[in-house]
Amino acid sequence: KKSFVTKHNYSLLRLTINSNEFHDEKNYLIEISIKDNSKKIQNLNFKIKVHHTASIPKLIDSNFFYTNWFNINKMEEKHTLKRWSDKWYKMLEKYAKIMADGRQNCIIIPGELISLKNNKIHLDEDKMISFINVFRKNGFKYFESPHLLGRGKNDDWGSPELITNLRGRGYFSEEAKKDIDTIIRKIKKFTKKNNLTNQWLQHIADEPTDNNAECYKQVSKQIRAIYPEIKIMEATNAKESLNGAIDFWCPIINDFQENEEFFRSREKIGEKVLIYTCLVPGGKWLNRTLDMERIRQVYFGWAGSKYNTFGYLHWGLNQYKADPFKQSVVKHPSPIASPTNYLPAGDTHIIYPGKDGPLSSLRFEAHRKGIEDYELLEILKSKNKRKHSKIVKKLFLDYENYSTSISKYRRIKRKLLKSL
């Protein structure tokens, strides 16, 4: 028996029980008593049915790729930390653990670790491997590089030329090409030395378009000439114009669903496809904003199993633009955003800064539940594809058509567990 005492009029409590606590395949009863000055107000009873025939693989063994982009500046700001200090690493461990508990298995590398030192490009190998090792220890499988180029300070979506993030040089200049050459050679040396070749995912520029696709392809060609084994991954807006430049495609879900034939053609030649959402799409499309049903986040795992996609990406683990406890809708940060362009509720984050570390959220836990469902569905698929398809169709048809009935979800989930 455990007790918790609060002096506040209103409290939100979360009960988490490790599955290792359940040793036998039977029913368990959990009773929660709510009291006021020793006077019982209400009893809450929860029944748990254990299915030992079903098991979730360890994070390192998961085949579902999942990344939420992590902002170390916000971690430091919210917890008053000095970068690279002992306290900083202890807090980083807490953030790595909460991500791992949510089934996240990829982390983006801080951009500052590739910097200018005495006007020369420097990759801080010691700090980079110390950062990576915190996440390795927690079962992370993939590591995303910082983006090497972008649309420049003015966020120019119409320009055909990408701009280097380090020095602000247009890629078509010889100086920019030399910078990319230097960075990739340093990345190659670092990843080979630390046995990261198969875990390193190289970003070039976020959301390339038809306008800058030719430039993007030239960068990709240069990188592969230096480091042929490297895998290039990108959240994409363009399609055919980027053919041959990307190994891991990451279209937004409506782009994937409306152009599935194109992405299947890329898979046939050995490329992978995962999906992402951000401030869009809205309506009935799956997304994870605060004003949507939690069941939508669960279905990202079901979609992965139905479509055989590689995983899911989102830009907002903790990209706070305001106090997340007070304001969930914020102005779009782009310098070219119109005065009425706002990010939807909760788009910037899915965890919260607590007093002593990060706090999970219902959305984050729903997403975790969906990825765990993915693992179970994949086991069933390997045993009985027909039954797998039948179970998925009872809840999820596509990214716009799915059941929002929690009772139906639980009923079908029980069928899934019994099928294993």
Where are these regions (language model features)?
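Glycoside hydrolase catalytic-domain groove-lining segments
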Residues: 182, 243-281
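Extracellular Ig-like/FN3 beta-sandwich strand-entry sites
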Residues: 10, 25-29
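Catalytic domains of carbohydrate-active enzymes that cleave complex glycans
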Residues: 168, 172, 176, 180-216, ...
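Short, glycine/acidic-rich beta->alpha junctions
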Residues: 24, 90-91, 123-127, 215, ...
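Substrate-binding cleft of secreted/luminal carbohydrate-active enzymes
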Residues: 292-342
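Active-site clefts of carbohydrate-active enzymes
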Residues: 267-297, 316
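Surface-exposed binding patches on compact interaction domains or structured appendages
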Residues: 1-14
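Aromatic-lined carbohydrate-binding surfaces of glycoside hydrolases
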Residues: 18-21, 29-36, 42-226, 235-246, ...
